[in-house]
Amino acid sequence: MTETDGFYRSREVLDPAEQYKMDHKRRGTALIFNHERFFWHLALPERRGTNADRDNPTRRFSELGFEVKCFNDLRAEELLLKIHEVSTSSHVDADCFLCVFLSHGEGNHIYAYDAKIEIQTLTGLFKGDKCQSLVGKPKIFIIQACRGSQHDVPLVPLDVVDHQTDKLDDNVTQVDAASVYTLPAGADFLMCYSVAEGYYSHRETVNGSWYIQDLSEMLARHGSSLEFTELLTLVNRKVSQRRVDFCKDPGAIGKKQVPCFASMLTKKLHFCPKPSK
């Protein structure tokens, strides 16, 4: 008797070049939740430089046709209300949806001004049973937050230690506190993280985070021409080539960072230019 491993053979021939439809009336809504300061009882440090992280992607996503809405230091109840409002709105005439969180993180939570919120509570509002007008459309979540307590060590330690001064205008590297876990979200979701799980996410106090800086640069160069997950791979490469030069923690000097993304997309994602009105 011959035994074989069972497998499923679909009769459907899949087109590897198939793309999401990007010919709707509008590109879609992009929400940016920016958190610089936190309620004192959380004992979380101020996130200097995060306003640059708000402004840079605002400009880039606007150029790609998104309607960008920015919110600063919202309380958890306010943030949930904004997310709920958008998830219950109609996206019938939109290509996709995008949401950016700039904050501290912990476990499977992200911090608002006064409390932490479970990320799956936020993404769950955009699943098919809750937001039918986004079924089959890309839902992109970008999370700039620390995800652990380790620095990525360079393989070739040829770094020169630079001494940091205490002037406010100096571009000092800091880290976002606590950790965020990689979370499943569902079909047509794309979860983008500033750093791989278990490692620090670096943020400069003047220029903003490494990840958002380099994501914004790649969007400016290739946002309308390159498939989006390929663009994210370029961002991974660019961030991985950075190192910490100025930091109050001498042990952080020379350390590295590598972002990551978890794609549940089912087609290629191109932000093709919209026709001029």
UniProtKB/Swiss-Prot annotation:
It comes from Rattus norvegicus. Its EC number is 3.4.22.59. Cysteine protease that plays essential roles in programmed cell death, axonal degeneration, development and innate immunity. Acts as a non-canonical executioner caspase during apoptosis: localizes in the nucleus and cleaves the nuclear structural protein NUMA1 and lamin A/LMNA thereby inducing nuclear shrinkage and fragmentation. Lamin-A/LMNA cleavage is required for chromatin condensation and nuclear disassembly during apoptotic execution. It catalyses: Strict requirement for Asp at position P1 and has a preferred cleavage sequence of Val-Glu-His-Asp-|-. Phosphorylated by NUAK1; phosphorylation inhibits self-activation. Phosphorylation at Ser-240 by AMP-activated protein kinase (PRKAA1 or PRKAA2) inhibits autocleavage, preventing caspase activation, thereby preventing hepatocyte apoptosis. Palmitoylation by ZDHHC17 blocks dimerization and subsequent activation, leading to inhibit the cysteine protease activity. The lineage of its organism: Eukaryota, Metazoa, Chordata, Craniata, Vertebrata. This is Caspase-6. One of its GO terms (biological process) is cellular response to staurosporine. During activation, the N-terminal disordered prodomain is removed by cleavage. Concomitantly, double cleavage gives rise to a large 18-kDa and a small 11-kDa subunit. The two large and two small subunits then assemble to form the active CASP6 complex. Can be cleaved and activated by different caspases, depending on the context. Cleaved and activated by caspase-8 (CASP8) and subsequently by caspase-3 (CASP3). Can also undergo autoactivation by mediating autocleavage at Asp-162 and Asp-176, while it is not able to cleave its N-terminal disordered prodomain. Residues 25-27 are annotated as: Tri-arginine exosite. The keyword Lipoprotein applies.
